[in-house]
């Protein structure tokens, strides 16, 4: 019953706040990445908390609940960071063993104060098991080196969750990087559907935020 109510409220909200014409306005206004006022309302609706566990003050509606929202957003071609910052990033953050970091990031995602993008793809073909980006231990941090492509909403994100080969065990790890860290170069682009993405180069960026998740 709660899932049905969520779907109904989402449909009504988007019909009122995000008609198909909204995408055209963003597209024709210098490729604006998303409507910030609309995003604020989505946060207030609780959509950013849908898949976050109650332990972290989330709504714990699961992927079925979030799927209801994404389905309706797809019908209206609604542009927002919910795919990158909520679906993709929250899922990977949940894998971390660092509870204090998880609590902090989940809170920032839920209140909309921070946006997070996943940086994983390295070429034109999706191959999640292959990465040329490397992560090496260096004193009190890590050295990250490599290039990522097609980073969704990379131009507006505060953090990147980056996949890399851990030099110590050759396994794929994920780590959190401040988007403004020294040694990161951004090349922002626009998809044919007017959505923005970035190609990002990490050149000896020192990570102090947390141990990588393996």
Where do the language-model regions lie?
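A short core secondary-structure module
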Residues: 119, 147-185
